[in-house]
């Protein structure tokens, strides 16, 4: 079951990476400190190079799965990228996974509360976008 979830999460990321205009680094230096990933990802997001930002977050998640407070940050940022690119269905699924980690992870006590709060707020916005209320005339 987890392999299926993982595949469903990684497949759109791979498609986005392969189809995007900005090129991602062919290789990331093995000596990069954890903070470099977030710095580079944020710079890419500021430049609207979402595929590059996703790449840095994905590599971070593979290299540093034991740093739980930063892992939840990377997962949140990935969801935010899909929200910004208007892939509301997929971003909704990712934000729900972030919230699920707060509920079910044994490491949830280490997670900064802000990602939970922000995920809940953005999920409400996504629901409004996916299910717009009809205005009475």
Positions of PLM-derived features:
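Sec-dependent bacterial lipoprotein signal peptides
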Residues: 1-23
């Amino acid at each position: 079951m987890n392999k299926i979830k993982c595949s469903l999460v990684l497949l759109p990321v791979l498609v986005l990476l392969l189809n995007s205009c900005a090129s991602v680094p062919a290789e990331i230096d093995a000596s990069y400190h954890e903070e470099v990933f977030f710095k580079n990802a944020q710079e890419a997001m500021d430049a609207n190079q979402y595929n590059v930002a996703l790449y840095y977050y994905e590599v971070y998640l593979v290299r540093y799965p034991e740093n739980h407070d930063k892992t939840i940050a990377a997962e949140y940022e990935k969801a935010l990228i899909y929200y910004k690119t208007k892939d509301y269905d997929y971003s909704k699924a990712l934000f729900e996974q972030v919230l699920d980690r707060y509920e079910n992870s044994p490491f949830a006590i280490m997670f900064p509360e802000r990602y939970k709060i922000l995920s809940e707020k953005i999920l409400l916005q996504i629901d409004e976008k996916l299910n717009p209320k009809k205005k009475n005339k």
